[in-house]
A protein has these predicted regions:
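Bacterial N-terminal signal peptides
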Residues: 5-19
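Extracellular/periplasmic catalytic domains that process cell-envelope and extracellular macromolecules
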Residues: 33, 66-67, 101-105
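The canonical Cys-X-X-Cys-His
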Residues: 47-51, 109
Length: 140
C-alpha cells in the first residue's frame, strides 16, 4: 500500500577523436561519459508532504544548474488512492511503476541514468540526504 510520507553502477566511457594531418584515431577514455539523467517525481495532490515539496524544494531546485542539465518528469495523481492507475502514468514511464513496491511512500523520486534506476528516495529527508546529492554527483 502506498502512503504519504538499488543502486546500480554506471559504466562510463567516451570516445575521443584526435584529428591530425596524417590520420584520425579514436581512443576510449574511461570515466568521461556523462549519463542522460532523468528525475522522476511521483506524488499526489492529496499528500501534504508532496504539496510542500512542490511549493518549496522543487521551486528552489528548478532554478539550479543541475535541473537545467537533467530531464524532469512528474507523475501527479489527484488522489493517493489512484496513484498507480494507468491514466496517471504515461506509457513510457509505466515500466518504472513496478519499482515502487507495496511499501512505497510519496513523495517519491527515481533518479534514472541512461534508463537505469540508480537511486530511489521517499520523503523530504531522503530528498535532501540521498536523491539531491546523487543528482549533483552524476551531473558534475
Amino acid at each position: 500500500m502506498l502512503h504519504c510520507g538499488a543502486l546500480y553502477g554506471i559504466v562510463e566511457s567516451a570516445v575521443i577523436i584526435t584529428v591530425t594531418a596524417a590520420a584520425i584515431s579514436t581512443q576510449r577514455v574511461p570515466g568521461s561519459h556523462r549519463p542522460q539523467v532523468t528525475l522522476l517525481y511521483v506524488g499526489a495532490e492529496d499528500c501534504a508532504p508532496c504539496r510542500e515539496w512542490q511549493q518549496h524544494e522543487k521551486i528552489a531546485f528548478s532554478t539550479s544548474a543541475e535541473f537545467a542539465r537533467l530531464k524532469y518528469r512528474e507523475i501527479k495523481s489527484p488522489s493517493l488512492l489512484n496513484l498507480l492507475k494507468d491514466e496517471n502514468w504515461p506509457e513510457d514511464l509505466r515500466s518504472y511503476r513496478g519499482l515502487l513496491g507495496p511499501d512505497a511512500g510519496v513523495p517519491l523520486w527515481l533518479v534514472i541514468a541512461d534508463e537505469q534506476v540508480i537511486q530511489r528516495g521517499m520523503g523530504p529527508t531522503q530528498w535532501r540526504s540521498d536523491v539531491l546529492p546523487k543528482i549533483i554527483k552524476l551531473l558534475r
